[in-house]
Protein backbone atom coordinates (compact mmCIF):
# COMPACT_ATOMS: atom_id res chain seq x y z
CA UNK A 1 0.00 0.00 0.00
CA UNK A 2 1.28 3.44 -0.92
CA UNK A 3 1.84 5.78 1.97
CA UNK A 4 0.29 8.67 0.05
CA UNK A 5 -2.27 8.45 -2.74
CA UNK A 6 -3.44 11.53 -4.60
CA UNK A 7 -6.57 11.65 -6.76
CA UNK A 8 -6.60 14.44 -9.34
CA UNK A 9 -9.69 15.71 -11.13
CA UNK A 10 -8.16 17.19 -14.27
CA UNK A 11 -9.34 20.34 -16.00
CA UNK A 12 -8.00 23.03 -18.28
CA UNK A 13 -6.81 25.48 -15.63
CA UNK A 14 -8.11 24.29 -12.23
CA UNK A 15 -7.15 20.96 -10.65
CA UNK A 16 -8.96 19.40 -7.68
CA UNK A 17 -6.81 17.15 -5.46
CA UNK A 18 -7.83 14.66 -2.79
CA UNK A 19 -4.93 13.30 -0.71
CA UNK A 20 -5.46 9.98 1.08
CA UNK A 21 -3.40 8.21 3.71
CA UNK A 22 -2.49 4.52 3.88
CA UNK A 23 -6.07 3.67 4.94
CA UNK A 24 -7.54 5.49 1.91
CA UNK A 25 -9.02 8.22 4.11
CA UNK A 26 -9.03 11.73 2.65
CA UNK A 27 -6.76 13.88 4.80
CA UNK A 28 -6.28 16.88 2.50
CA UNK A 29 -8.10 18.57 -0.36
CA UNK A 30 -6.69 21.25 -2.62
CA UNK A 31 -7.95 23.33 -5.52
CA UNK A 32 -4.94 24.44 -7.54
CA UNK A 33 -4.16 26.36 -10.68
CA UNK A 34 -1.95 24.81 -13.32
CA UNK A 35 1.20 26.51 -11.98
CA UNK A 36 0.37 25.61 -8.38
CA UNK A 37 -0.34 22.02 -9.45
CA UNK A 38 3.14 21.61 -10.95
CA UNK A 39 4.76 23.24 -7.93
CA UNK A 40 2.77 21.09 -5.47
CA UNK A 41 4.15 17.81 -6.83
CA UNK A 42 7.68 19.21 -6.91
CA UNK A 43 7.64 19.52 -3.10
CA UNK A 44 5.82 16.30 -2.14
CA UNK A 45 6.79 12.65 -1.79
CA UNK A 46 3.83 10.98 -3.51
CA UNK A 47 3.44 7.24 -3.96
CA UNK A 48 0.52 7.03 -6.40
CA UNK A 49 -1.49 9.50 -8.46
CA UNK A 50 -4.83 8.46 -9.98
CA UNK A 51 -6.68 10.40 -12.67
CA UNK A 52 -9.56 9.95 -15.08
CA UNK A 53 -8.74 9.11 -18.67
CA UNK A 54 -9.93 12.32 -20.32
CA UNK A 55 -8.55 15.23 -22.30
CA UNK A 56 -4.85 15.92 -21.52
CA UNK A 57 -4.82 12.84 -19.26
CA UNK A 58 -1.93 11.13 -21.06
CA UNK A 59 0.32 14.19 -20.75
CA UNK A 60 0.25 14.33 -16.96
CA UNK A 61 1.28 10.70 -16.27
CA UNK A 62 4.27 11.20 -18.57
CA UNK A 63 5.13 14.39 -16.70
CA UNK A 64 4.76 12.64 -13.31
CA UNK A 65 6.71 9.56 -14.39
CA UNK A 66 9.78 11.69 -15.17
CA UNK A 67 10.61 12.29 -11.45
CA UNK A 68 9.59 8.72 -10.58
CA UNK A 69 5.98 9.21 -9.43
CA UNK A 70 3.62 6.38 -10.35
CA UNK A 71 0.51 7.60 -12.19
CA UNK A 72 -2.54 5.56 -13.07
CA UNK A 73 -5.36 6.42 -15.49
CA UNK A 74 -8.82 5.00 -14.82
CA UNK A 75 -11.66 4.78 -17.38
CA UNK A 76 -14.02 7.69 -16.80
CA UNK A 77 -17.16 5.60 -17.35
CA UNK A 78 -16.18 3.30 -14.45
CA UNK A 79 -15.23 6.15 -12.13
CA UNK A 80 -18.65 7.75 -12.66
CA UNK A 81 -20.30 4.88 -10.77
CA UNK A 82 -18.47 5.90 -7.58
CA UNK A 83 -19.71 9.52 -7.57
CA UNK A 84 -22.09 10.06 -4.65
CA UNK A 85 -24.79 12.74 -4.53
CA UNK A 86 -24.10 15.77 -6.72
CA UNK A 87 -21.32 15.95 -9.28
CA UNK A 88 -18.62 18.41 -8.21
CA UNK A 89 -14.86 18.50 -8.65
CA UNK A 90 -14.39 17.41 -5.03
CA UNK A 91 -16.87 14.54 -5.47
CA UNK A 92 -15.06 13.43 -8.64
CA UNK A 93 -11.72 13.37 -6.82
CA UNK A 94 -13.21 11.33 -3.97
CA UNK A 95 -14.76 8.95 -6.51
CA UNK A 96 -11.34 8.46 -8.08
CA UNK A 97 -9.98 7.29 -4.73
CA UNK A 98 -12.83 4.80 -4.36
CA UNK A 99 -12.33 3.52 -7.91
CA UNK A 100 -8.58 3.16 -7.35
CA UNK A 101 -9.31 0.73 -4.51
CA UNK A 102 -11.39 -1.52 -6.78
CA UNK A 103 -9.31 -4.43 -8.00
CA UNK A 104 -11.54 -5.16 -11.01
CA UNK A 105 -11.04 -1.83 -12.80
CA UNK A 106 -8.32 -2.11 -15.42
CA UNK A 107 -6.22 1.06 -15.74
CA UNK A 108 -5.81 2.73 -19.10
CA UNK A 109 -2.37 2.35 -20.61
CA UNK A 110 -0.57 5.69 -20.94
CA UNK A 111 0.21 6.59 -24.54
CA UNK A 112 3.60 7.88 -25.61
CA UNK A 113 4.08 11.18 -27.44
CA UNK A 114 4.65 9.28 -30.69
CA UNK A 115 1.43 7.29 -30.26
CA UNK A 116 -0.60 10.44 -29.67
CA UNK A 117 1.00 12.17 -32.66
CA UNK A 118 0.14 9.22 -34.92
CA UNK A 119 -3.37 9.09 -33.53
CA UNK A 120 -3.64 12.82 -34.18
CA UNK A 121 -2.86 12.26 -37.86
CA UNK A 122 -5.76 9.83 -38.06
CA UNK A 123 -8.09 12.30 -36.35
CA UNK A 124 -7.06 15.08 -38.75
CA UNK A 125 -7.64 12.79 -41.73
CA UNK A 126 -11.11 11.88 -40.44
CA UNK A 127 -11.85 15.59 -39.96
CA UNK A 128 -10.78 16.40 -43.51
CA UNK A 129 -12.74 13.45 -44.90
CA UNK A 130 -15.87 14.64 -43.11
CA UNK A 131 -15.36 18.19 -44.37
CA UNK A 132 -14.87 16.94 -47.93
CA UNK A 133 -18.04 14.84 -47.73
CA UNK A 134 -20.09 17.78 -46.42
CA UNK A 135 -18.83 20.01 -49.25
CA UNK A 136 -19.68 17.41 -51.89
CA UNK A 137 -23.15 16.90 -50.42
CA UNK A 138 -23.72 20.66 -50.42
CA UNK A 139 -22.85 20.85 -54.13
CA UNK A 140 -25.12 17.87 -54.83
CA UNK A 141 -27.96 19.70 -53.10
CA UNK A 142 -27.39 22.91 -55.06
CA UNK A 143 -27.38 21.03 -58.37
CA UNK A 144 -30.50 19.10 -57.44
CA UNK A 145 -32.38 22.34 -56.71
CA UNK A 146 -31.84 23.32 -60.33
CA UNK A 147 -32.92 19.97 -61.75
CA UNK A 148 -29.45 18.42 -62.15
CA UNK A 149 -28.88 14.99 -60.57
CA UNK A 150 -25.37 13.93 -59.61
CA UNK A 151 -24.39 10.22 -59.58
CA UNK A 152 -23.43 8.53 -56.31
CA UNK A 153 -19.79 8.16 -55.28
CA UNK A 154 -17.31 10.85 -54.30
CA UNK A 155 -15.03 10.54 -57.34
CA UNK A 156 -17.85 10.13 -59.88
CA UNK A 157 -19.86 12.89 -58.25
CA UNK A 158 -16.97 15.37 -58.27
CA UNK A 159 -16.29 14.70 -61.94
CA UNK A 160 -19.96 15.27 -62.77
CA UNK A 161 -20.16 18.46 -60.69
CA UNK A 162 -17.00 19.76 -62.35
CA UNK A 163 -18.51 19.22 -65.80
CA UNK A 164 -21.76 20.89 -64.77
CA UNK A 165 -20.01 23.99 -63.41
CA UNK A 166 -17.67 24.23 -66.40
CA UNK A 167 -20.53 24.11 -68.93
CA UNK A 168 -22.19 27.55 -69.29
CA UNK A 169 -25.22 25.92 -70.91
CA UNK A 170 -26.30 24.14 -67.74
CA UNK A 171 -29.13 25.41 -65.53
CA UNK A 172 -26.82 26.61 -62.74
CA UNK A 173 -27.39 30.39 -62.31
CA UNK A 174 -24.40 32.62 -62.85
CA UNK A 175 -24.95 34.15 -59.41
CA UNK A 176 -23.97 30.92 -57.62
CA UNK A 177 -21.69 29.38 -60.23
CA UNK A 178 -18.54 31.25 -59.13
CA UNK A 179 -19.05 30.46 -55.45
CA UNK A 180 -19.72 26.81 -56.26
CA UNK A 181 -16.44 26.69 -58.18
CA UNK A 182 -14.67 28.05 -55.08
CA UNK A 183 -16.25 25.19 -53.14
CA UNK A 184 -14.84 22.78 -55.72
CA UNK A 185 -11.39 24.28 -55.20
CA UNK A 186 -11.74 23.71 -51.45
CA UNK A 187 -12.56 20.05 -52.11
CA UNK A 188 -9.53 19.63 -54.37
CA UNK A 189 -7.32 21.25 -51.71
CA UNK A 190 -8.70 18.86 -49.09
CA UNK A 191 -8.04 15.91 -51.37
CA UNK A 192 -4.44 17.03 -51.85
CA UNK A 193 -3.97 17.37 -48.09
CA UNK A 194 -5.50 13.94 -47.45
CA UNK A 195 -3.20 12.39 -50.06
CA UNK A 196 -0.16 14.08 -48.47
CA UNK A 197 -1.16 12.83 -45.02
CA UNK A 198 -1.58 9.29 -46.34
CA UNK A 199 1.91 9.48 -47.86
CA UNK A 200 3.25 10.42 -44.41
CA UNK A 201 1.45 7.42 -42.93
CA UNK A 202 2.95 5.21 -45.65
CA UNK A 203 6.47 6.42 -44.85
CA UNK A 204 5.87 5.76 -41.16
CA UNK A 205 4.51 2.27 -41.85
CA UNK A 206 7.62 1.36 -43.85
CA UNK A 207 9.79 2.10 -40.81
CA UNK A 208 7.56 0.29 -38.29
CA UNK A 209 8.09 -3.48 -37.83
CA UNK A 210 4.68 -3.73 -36.15
CA UNK A 211 2.96 -2.13 -39.16
CA UNK A 212 4.73 -4.50 -41.55
CA UNK A 213 3.55 -7.44 -39.47
CA UNK A 214 -0.05 -6.21 -39.35
CA UNK A 215 -0.17 -5.58 -43.09
CA UNK A 216 0.18 -9.34 -43.64
CA UNK A 217 -3.29 -9.92 -42.14
CA UNK A 218 -6.15 -10.14 -44.70
CA UNK A 219 -8.30 -7.01 -44.60
CA UNK A 220 -5.71 -4.90 -42.77
CA UNK A 221 -4.42 -1.98 -44.79
CA UNK A 222 -2.43 1.18 -44.17
CA UNK A 223 -5.04 2.95 -42.03
CA UNK A 224 -5.87 -0.06 -39.86
CA UNK A 225 -2.22 -0.98 -39.29
CA UNK A 226 -1.09 2.53 -38.34
CA UNK A 227 -4.18 3.15 -36.18
CA UNK A 228 -3.58 -0.11 -34.31
CA UNK A 229 0.06 0.81 -33.71
CA UNK A 230 -1.07 4.23 -32.48
CA UNK A 231 -3.46 2.54 -30.04
CA UNK A 232 -1.14 -0.22 -28.79
CA UNK A 233 2.42 0.83 -29.81
CA UNK A 234 2.71 -2.70 -31.20
CA UNK A 235 2.83 -4.18 -27.68
CA UNK A 236 -0.12 -6.39 -26.67
CA UNK A 237 1.41 -7.86 -23.52
CA UNK A 238 -1.08 -6.04 -21.29
CA UNK A 239 -3.98 -7.93 -22.90
CA UNK A 240 -4.91 -11.21 -21.25
CA UNK A 241 -5.61 -13.07 -24.50
CA UNK A 242 -6.89 -12.63 -28.04
CA UNK A 243 -10.51 -12.40 -26.93
CA UNK A 244 -9.63 -9.61 -24.52
CA UNK A 245 -7.95 -7.79 -27.42
CA UNK A 246 -11.02 -8.19 -29.65
CA UNK A 247 -13.29 -7.00 -26.84
CA UNK A 248 -11.19 -3.82 -26.62
CA UNK A 249 -12.69 -2.87 -30.02
CA UNK A 250 -16.24 -3.91 -29.06
CA UNK A 251 -16.22 -6.87 -31.48
CA UNK A 252 -17.15 -9.58 -28.97
CA UNK A 253 -20.81 -10.42 -28.30
CA UNK A 254 -22.73 -9.13 -25.33
CA UNK A 255 -23.55 -11.85 -22.84
CA UNK A 256 -26.90 -12.29 -21.09
CA UNK A 257 -26.63 -15.19 -18.66
CA UNK A 258 -28.78 -16.40 -15.79
CA UNK A 259 -28.15 -19.62 -13.92
CA UNK A 260 -27.38 -22.35 -16.43
CA UNK A 261 -28.79 -20.33 -19.34
CA UNK A 262 -26.26 -18.48 -21.47
CA UNK A 263 -27.14 -16.19 -24.36
CA UNK A 264 -24.69 -14.30 -26.58
CA UNK A 265 -26.22 -11.32 -28.36
CA UNK A 266 -24.94 -8.67 -30.72
CA UNK A 267 -21.45 -7.20 -30.50
CA UNK A 268 -20.90 -4.91 -27.52
CA UNK A 269 -19.69 -1.87 -29.55
CA UNK A 270 -17.56 -0.76 -26.62
CA UNK A 271 -14.02 0.52 -26.80
CA UNK A 272 -12.28 2.09 -29.78
CA UNK A 273 -15.02 2.77 -32.34
CA UNK A 274 -12.56 4.10 -34.94
CA UNK A 275 -10.56 0.87 -35.06
CA UNK A 276 -13.77 -1.16 -34.93
CA UNK A 277 -14.96 0.72 -38.00
CA UNK A 278 -11.68 0.09 -39.84
CA UNK A 279 -11.67 -3.62 -39.00
CA UNK A 280 -15.31 -3.98 -40.06
CA UNK A 281 -14.71 -2.21 -43.38
CA UNK A 282 -11.66 -4.41 -43.95
CA UNK A 283 -13.75 -7.51 -43.23
CA UNK A 284 -16.41 -6.39 -45.70
CA UNK A 285 -13.73 -5.91 -48.34
CA UNK A 286 -12.32 -9.40 -47.72
CA UNK A 287 -15.80 -10.93 -47.89
CA UNK A 288 -16.61 -9.19 -51.15
CA UNK A 289 -13.30 -10.19 -52.76
CA UNK A 290 -13.73 -13.79 -51.58
CA UNK A 291 -17.23 -13.96 -53.04
CA UNK A 292 -16.00 -12.59 -56.38
CA UNK A 293 -13.14 -15.11 -56.41
CA UNK A 294 -15.53 -17.95 -55.62
CA UNK A 295 -17.86 -16.85 -58.41
CA UNK A 296 -14.93 -16.82 -60.84
CA UNK A 297 -14.10 -20.43 -59.94
CA UNK A 298 -10.89 -19.64 -58.04
CA UNK A 299 -10.00 -21.49 -54.85
CA UNK A 300 -10.88 -19.73 -51.61
CA UNK A 301 -9.18 -21.01 -48.45
CA UNK A 302 -8.22 -20.05 -44.90
CA UNK A 303 -10.09 -17.27 -43.15
CA UNK A 304 -11.78 -16.26 -46.41
CA UNK A 305 -13.30 -19.73 -46.74
CA UNK A 306 -14.33 -19.60 -43.09
CA UNK A 307 -15.99 -16.20 -43.57
CA UNK A 308 -17.93 -17.40 -46.63
CA UNK A 309 -19.15 -20.42 -44.65
CA UNK A 310 -20.37 -18.09 -41.88
CA UNK A 311 -22.14 -15.94 -44.48
CA UNK A 312 -23.87 -19.03 -45.88
CA UNK A 313 -25.13 -20.01 -42.42
CA UNK A 314 -26.23 -16.49 -41.39
CA UNK A 315 -25.98 -13.29 -43.46
CA UNK A 316 -23.44 -10.83 -44.83
CA UNK A 317 -23.43 -8.38 -41.91
CA UNK A 318 -23.02 -11.07 -39.26
CA UNK A 319 -20.25 -12.67 -41.30
CA UNK A 320 -18.49 -9.28 -41.59
CA UNK A 321 -18.61 -8.77 -37.80
CA UNK A 322 -17.42 -12.34 -37.20
CA UNK A 323 -14.54 -11.84 -39.64
CA UNK A 324 -13.63 -8.49 -38.04
CA UNK A 325 -13.48 -10.31 -34.69
CA UNK A 326 -11.27 -12.98 -36.23
CA UNK A 327 -9.01 -10.33 -37.81
CA UNK A 328 -8.55 -8.63 -34.42
CA UNK A 329 -7.50 -11.95 -32.89
CA UNK A 330 -5.07 -12.62 -35.74
CA UNK A 331 -3.61 -9.12 -35.26
CA UNK A 332 -3.11 -9.94 -31.59
CA UNK A 333 -1.25 -13.16 -32.47
CA UNK A 334 0.99 -11.44 -35.03
CA UNK A 335 1.90 -8.62 -32.63
CA UNK A 336 2.46 -11.07 -29.77
CA UNK A 337 4.69 -13.40 -31.81
CA UNK A 338 6.21 -10.58 -33.92
CA UNK A 339 5.74 -12.71 -37.03
CA UNK A 340 3.65 -12.00 -40.15
CA UNK A 341 0.45 -13.94 -40.70
CA UNK A 342 1.12 -16.95 -42.93
CA UNK A 343 -2.18 -18.24 -44.23
CA UNK A 344 -1.95 -21.85 -45.41
CA UNK A 345 -2.96 -22.93 -48.88
CA UNK A 346 -4.88 -26.00 -47.62
CA UNK A 347 -8.63 -25.43 -47.17
CA UNK A 348 -9.55 -25.49 -43.47
CA UNK A 349 -12.45 -27.51 -42.18
CA UNK A 350 -14.47 -26.34 -39.20
CA UNK A 351 -12.49 -28.28 -36.60
CA UNK A 352 -9.06 -27.19 -37.84
CA UNK A 353 -10.26 -23.60 -38.22
CA UNK A 354 -11.17 -23.47 -34.52
CA UNK A 355 -7.88 -24.97 -33.40
CA UNK A 356 -5.84 -22.62 -35.57
CA UNK A 357 -6.78 -19.56 -33.52
CA UNK A 358 -6.67 -20.94 -29.98
CA UNK A 359 -4.42 -18.75 -27.86
CA UNK A 360 -2.11 -20.45 -25.32
CA UNK A 361 -3.06 -20.11 -21.66
Segments and roles (model prediction):
Residues 1-3, 195-220, 228-233:
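Extended, structured, electrostatic nucleic-acid-contact surfaces
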Residues 82, 213-222, 226-312, 353, ...:
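Phosphate-backbone recognition surface of nucleic-acid-processing proteins
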Amino acid sequence: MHATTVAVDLAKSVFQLAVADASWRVVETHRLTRTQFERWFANRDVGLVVMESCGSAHHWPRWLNAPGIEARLLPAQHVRAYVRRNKTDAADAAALLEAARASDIRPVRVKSVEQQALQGLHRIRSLWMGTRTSRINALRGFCREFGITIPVGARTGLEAIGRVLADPATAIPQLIRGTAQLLMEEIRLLQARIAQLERELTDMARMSPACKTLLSVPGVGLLTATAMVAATSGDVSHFKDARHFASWFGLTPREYSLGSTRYLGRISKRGDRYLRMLLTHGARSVLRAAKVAQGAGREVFGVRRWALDVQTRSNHNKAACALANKMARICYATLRDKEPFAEGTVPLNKKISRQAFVMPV
